[in-house]
């Protein structure tokens, strides 16, 4: 591989490798050169024919190594079947290193090339599945500066987290993005982005990924990878397939700039449709209808208590009782259910400082509440945040007093 950490290393590496590439090209094979790693793709109608081609090309590689005074890594040199159903029970391929000296190349079912994990049959499932572990480890390292109660503000933490992990996840998406048409691929990316969003949102672990995505305003990462893959194909003039959001006819009749805008519009349309039909995050959906809202709003930085109301998940008794964490779902005011809507709109404990009109909450004819007006302006949103924080402070104060009285009388 290319020496790491030096300025001139890659240039010198390219110069030294050029001789081997010229010899390989002269032997009648197509050469596609990438810095750092070397891969030889051999094809044939039988396994014996494939091994013969590999043998010829590896002999060139070994001779080049002897000439340059370097050795080929036996540990990293492996072979794998990318297509076809040749017998691989032997799990090794013999190639001639020198005259009458043979080396066995280990057969593997998965290898990492240029940062992408490739499996037999040209599959990328392992690459996508591995993202969850990779992202989780990275998030743990960043938690010291991304605390919930102190540290970077929302905008900065979002920028750091998204800027750190999205490029890692979407790297080389144009090669493997078709894996995302399968549920396991989408679930793997969803699990990865969940770690990142949880690190910069004041939410309970029980909040759905769909709701977190809307609260951050981040395009779901499977759609982000689809978008980047489509933009890459548009810029390179590559043929589109049924999974892509633009068609070949549109590519032929539109400019690159218009196509990039079209790709962006359509992936957001897909996200909006998902949010409308989803069964998850329905409390959040009563406040935020447009998935682009959080991404556009500079003032939307909900704290812990506000997020509890926007998601319906938190320390309220109705939520805790449903999960067996509270003996009763009742409110201290005497109501049978202390849920988010009760606290925000009906609880008599907070009646003295509640003003639904100022918060943008509308009472419908049937007695139900409409909350889309809450986020229609900074004024209504600010009034709601002010009310929620004041209500939670009073609630905690009353709970402490009641607990103290129980301790005294107990």
UniProtKB/Swiss-Prot annotation:
It catalyses: DNA(n) + a 2'-deoxyribonucleoside 5'-triphosphate = DNA(n+1) + diphosphate. Residues 1-118 form the Reverse transcriptase domain. Keywords: Endonuclease, Hydrolase, Nuclease, Nucleotidyltransferase, RNA-directed DNA polymerase, Transferase, Transposable element. It comes from the Eukaryota. This is Retrovirus-related Pol polyprotein from type-1 retrotransposable element R1 2. Pfam families: RVT_1. InterPro entries: DNA/RNA_pol_sf (IPR043502), RT_dom (IPR000477). Its EC number is 2.7.7.49. Residues 254-410 are annotated as: Nucleic acid-binding endonuclease. GO terms for molecular function: endonuclease activity; RNA-directed DNA polymerase activity.
């Amino acid at each position: 591989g290319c020496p790491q950490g030096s300025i001139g290393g890659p240039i010198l590496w390219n110069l030294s490798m050029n001789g081997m590439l010229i010899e390989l090209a002269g032997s009648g094979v197509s050469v596609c050169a990438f810095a750092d790693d070397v891969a030889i793709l051999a094809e044939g109608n039988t396994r014996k024919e494939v091994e013969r081609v590999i043998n010829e090309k590896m002999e060139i590689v070994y001779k080049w190594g002897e000439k340059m005074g370097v050795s080929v890594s036996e540990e990293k040199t492996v072979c794998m079947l990318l297509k076809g159903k040749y017998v691989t029970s032997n799990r090794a391929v013999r190639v001639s290193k020198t005259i009458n000296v043979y080396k066995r190349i280990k057969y593997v079912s998965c290898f990492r090339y240029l940062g992408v994990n490739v499996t037999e049959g040209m599959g990328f499932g392992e690459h996508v599945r591995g993202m969850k572990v990779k992202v989780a480890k990275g998030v743990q390292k960043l938690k010291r500066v991304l605390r919930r109660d102190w540290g970077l503000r929302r905008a900065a933490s979002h920028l750091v987290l998204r800027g750190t992990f999205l490029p890692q996840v979407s790297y080389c998406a144009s090669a493997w993005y078709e894996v995302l048409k399968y549920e396991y691929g989408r679930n793997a990316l969803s699990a990865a982005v969940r770690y990142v969003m949880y690190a910069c949102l004041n939410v309970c672990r029980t909040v759905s990924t769909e709701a977190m995505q809307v609260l951050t305003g981040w395009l779901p990462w499977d759609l982000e990878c689809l978008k980047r893959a489509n933009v890459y194909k548009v810029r390179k003039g590559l043929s589109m397939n049924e999974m892509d959001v633009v068609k070949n006819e549109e590519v032929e009749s539109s400019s690159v700039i218009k196509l990039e805008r079209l790709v962006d519009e359509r992936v957001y349309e897909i996200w909006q449709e998902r949010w409308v039909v989803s069964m998850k995050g329905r409390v959040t959906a009563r406040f935020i209808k447009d998935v682009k809202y959080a991404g556009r709003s500079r003032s939307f930085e909900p704290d812990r208590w506000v997020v509890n109301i926007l998601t319906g998940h938190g320390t309220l008794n109705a939520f805790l009782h449903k999960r067996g964490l509270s003996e009763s779902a009742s409110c201290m005011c005497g109501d049978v259910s202390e849920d988010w809507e009760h606290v925000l709109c009906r609880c008599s404990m907070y009646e003295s400082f509640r003003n639904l009109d100022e918060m943008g909450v509308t009472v419908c004819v049937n007695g139900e509440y409409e909350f889309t007006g809450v986020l229609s302006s900074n004024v209504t949103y600010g009034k709601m945040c002010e009310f929620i924080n004041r209500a939670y402070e009073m609630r905690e104060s009353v709970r402490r007093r009641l607990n103290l009285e129980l301790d005294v009388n107990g």
